[in-house]
A protein has these predicted regions:
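Enzyme catalytic cores with a strong preference for nitrogen-chemistry domains
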Residues: 1-299, 312-316, 326, 351
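ATP/NTP-dependent adenylation/nucleotidyl-transfer catalytic domains that generate, transfer
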Residues: 146, 212-213, 238, 264-302, ...
Length: 562
């Protein structure tokens, strides 16, 4: 049996458009001799559809799309894809997350998802009931009955010693052992997080060893709001060797012959910084495209955060579709302006300049009487940021551009950002990257190791992009004379590990103090994190690249202790 792995990039809620994607993939697979096409979880809906699943009209549209696929599928070809299935009663939730087999003339549900993730960004128990039977499909082909084990995404995540935690009960992989499948097909929609590609392989290898058969893992690709799906679908032999590896961060379709003895190939994972870069580019490109934007705008300060966002935007949308605005104040250094213009020239993006000194003076004059004097201190600093935010929003509004916020995760965590100022934007591209991660990624981008990746992304392959001057400059908001971030915050090399422990590892200040962290520092950082919650509630959506981001999976109260 020849299987095609269809790694598609769906648009959430576009059931007819996604059906067309699947049909095109099936026709291509048919020309390559495939007999079964395997598509991702909820392939017709796009993952995650969230409350779109509750709309009766869209449920009817899914049935119409499945009927259309059955009518137009090439003869002799079958399609296995993820669908939602209506439960036989009205008890809520009234859906199953399921897999359906489509063949010429009809379709039927053949498996239901057993383990429903309801943690972090996942909320499947809001919509779905769990299945209660292992998924096994028998297909006759070439005089042989193929026994195909089927599970859906989370059903594979059952190895506690690999996953690091037991998030739910049940063992769908173990329950298939007695059924002796010839193959295990896993339909996935697994979003990117740093280090996750290796974990997927380890989980698949564990399942292949337990079942004594190959694992076919088909993942979604593309950006859907904050989640970016990195693809990387694969076939793994029972030995744990990778037999087939699909592309990372782009759609792909490849055919594998299950009747041949699985031969492992050398298929190393991409460099972590390369995969992070390509994932961020994909997330930005798809967010813009799926929201109807062709062009983007950002403020360019001469600092490393806005420089990285400019690189990502040029790669995602093309240099000709990116505009950078310089908004120097009396406190902006000549070096920052020069560095910004040099960066824009290296990237080939357009620039504009609007000095803000006159606008600052206008605000000072307007506020002089009610404040009994000119704004000072933090008020004056925030006014500069809000002036810049207003200018950027005006240009983006007038010119139909997507405004990109350039703040990083460290700033969002401790509130070192200004509401209605530098937080303005439609997407916080690097809002899940700590400052130290920004420095590390920019250093990799400027290294010879990134040349091939840069060329593939449409960027100059030779020379520096971000530039040494920007990479080595001490971080500064330049809102007052001789300002440095370290005037207000601990050094990022000290701050970021603390933030990661508090956010991703959910450790308490007391635990950190017990392991040697300075008590005053731990309490201070925890206090900053807690008090900044009201700002994060109003922040632009970001691209999630860590195990815990300030997005839909971060559900902290604003008015709270702890």
């Amino acid at each position: 049996m020849r299987l095609a792995l269809a790694q598609i990039n769906p648009l959430v809620g576009d059931l007819s458009g996604n059906a067309a994607l699947l049909l095109a993939a099936c026709r291509t697979a048919h020309t390559q001799g495939a007999e079964l096409v395997v598509a991702p979880e909820l392939a017709l809906w796009g993952y995650p559809p969230r409350d779109l699943l509750l709309r009766p009209a869209l449920r009817r549209r899914q049935v119409e799309a499945l009927d259309q696929l059955a009518a137009e599928l090439p003869s002799g070809l079958a399609l296995l894809l993820g669908v939602s299935e209506a439960a036989p009663d009205r008890q809520q939730p009234d859906l199953f997350n399921a897999a359906a087999l489509v063949q010429s003339g009809g379709w039927r549900v053949v498996a239901r998802k057993r383990l429903l993730p309801s943690y972090d960004v996942f909320d499947e128990r809001r919509y779905f009931r769990p299945g209660d039977q292992p998924g096994l499909l028998e297909l006759e082909h070439g005089g042989r009955c193929w026994r195909l084990g089927i599970n859906i995404c989370e059903d594979l995540w059952v190895e506690e010693e690999l996953h690091g935690q037991r998030l739910r009960g049940g063992d769908p992989v173990g329950e298939l052992q007695a059924l002796r499948p010839d193959l295990l097909l896993n339909l996935s929609a697994s979003p990117f997080a740093q280090g996750k590609a290796q974990l997927r392989r380890r989980l698949a290898a564990a399942a292949a060893a337990r079942l004594g058969c190959p694992v076919v893992y088909v993942n979604q690709v593309g950006g859907n709001d904050e989640l970016v799906f990195d693809g990387g679908s694969f076939v793994m032999a029972a030995s744990g060797a990778v037999c087939l590896q699909l592309a990372w961060a782009e759609p792909d379709l490849q055919v594998w012959d299950a009747a041949l003895a699985p031969a492992g190939t050398t298929s190393p994972l991409p460099d972590p910084e390369e995969l992070l870069l390509r994932t961020l580019v994909l997330g930005l490109r798809d967010y813009a495209r799926k929201c109807g934007f062709r062009r983007a705008l950002l403020g360019l300060s001469g600092g490393i955060d806005s420089a990285l966002v400019a690189v990502l935007a040029a790669a995602a949308l093309g240099p000709g579709n990116v505009q950078a605005l310089l908004m120097p104040s009396p406190w902006s250094s000549a070096g920052s302006i020069e560095d910004s213009l040099a960066l824009a020239q290296r990237l080939g993006i357009a620039t504009g300049t609007v000095p803000i000194a006159a606008l600052m003076a206008g605000f000072d004059a307007a506020l002089n009487e009610p404040l009994a004097g000119a704004p000072a201190g933090l008020t004056a600093e925030n006014l500069q940021s809000r002036i810049r935010g207003t200018l950027l929003m005006a240009l983006a509004n007038q010119q139909g551009q997507l405004l990109l916020s350039t703040g990083n995760k460290s700033e969002l965590a401790v509130g070192y950002c200004t509401l209605y100022g530098d937080m303005n934007g439609g997407l916080a591209v690097i809002g899940d990257l700590y400052k130290t991660s920004v420095f590390r990624l920019c250093a990799w981008i400027d290294s010879p190791a990134a040349a091939a990746c840069r060329q593939a992304l449409g960027l100059a392959a030779e020379g520096e992009l971000v530039g040494r001057a920007i990479r080595e400059k001490p971080p500064s908001a330049e809102l007052r004379p001789d300002q440095r971030d370290s005037d207000s915050l601990p050094d990022y090399d000290q701050l970021d590990p603390l933030l990661k422990a508090l956010i991703e590892e959910q450790r308490s200040p007391e635990e950190l103090i017990a392991t040697g962290t300075d008590a005053a520092l731990a309490e201070r950082v925890q206090g900053l994190l807690r008090r900044a919650e009201f700002k994060r509630r109003q922040a632009a959506p970001l691209l999630k690249v860590s195990n815990r981001a300030f997005g839909s999976g971060w559900r902290m109260p604003i008015a709270a202790a702890g």
